[in-house]
Amino acid sequence: MFEYPLRPEELYAHQGLGISEDAFHQMLEDMVDKKLLSKKEGFYFSPFARHENIVRRKKGNVNALEMMPTAIKWGKRIFRFPFVRSVSLSGSLSKNYFDEHSDIDFFVVTKSGRLWICRTLLILYWKSLSLKNKKYFCTNYFIDETVLEMEEKNHFTATELSYLVPLINAAGFNNLMTHNTWVKSYINNRAPVLSYTINVQPGIVKKAIEALLQNPIGDMLDNFLLKKTIERWRRKYPELAAEDFELQFRSRKNVCKRHTKGFQNKVLQQLETLRADYETRTGVKLS
């Protein structure tokens, strides 16, 4: 974590100084001259980081490119399920990195009021997959098409949103980003990667199942699945305090987020630790 050398254009996407790209590049070079940054092979990184991370990054980038056809294939498969409205790529692959520890993570926008039916069908399908294929089918985040604004507005969420790669149906992705313009206060110069996006029409079976459940029975079933999922997770993770449970297993009518081991908190805490360490070792205040 935080050992990923960056190209100047990637750093520029995260800057909030309101300066031109040329001026920003010159600022980076000045920091290198003052030994506040290191530079090698066109990558910038902390002066306290290992140069070997460049080799690791390059290999991960090659792996990511090779994995994209697989991600698109599984994204299409997810979209075939009832009540899925759009599918985007998240996780490390959305950031152009993939290694032996990586999964393929998906961010799914669902029809309003049917998120939990949608998720349950996808989880049942996931359980039927081989161990190898399960790592290509990680649906960790579901959100209702009518409630798209993220509740948590922090650097972690901003990064995840701004690096989403829309795979199936760009309209759903565009609507998501329209409801989360706050992301620009963290990452304001990054354009989404749209080169993998395709528009797919729902199939006959998908339409039929959706029509069959577009009634009070569907409402009751969705509410039932929400209730049972929360009960199951509370039994499985009784050690979690209410606040931690809410953060790791956000389960509401219009959203489902499942991130075990407190990953978001760990990332944000490590970011602050590294920031403080850099300030101490260089004498430069970052905030």
Could you say what each language-model-derived stretch is?
Residues 1-86, 90-101, 111-287:
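Catalytic core of pol beta-like nucleotidyltransferases
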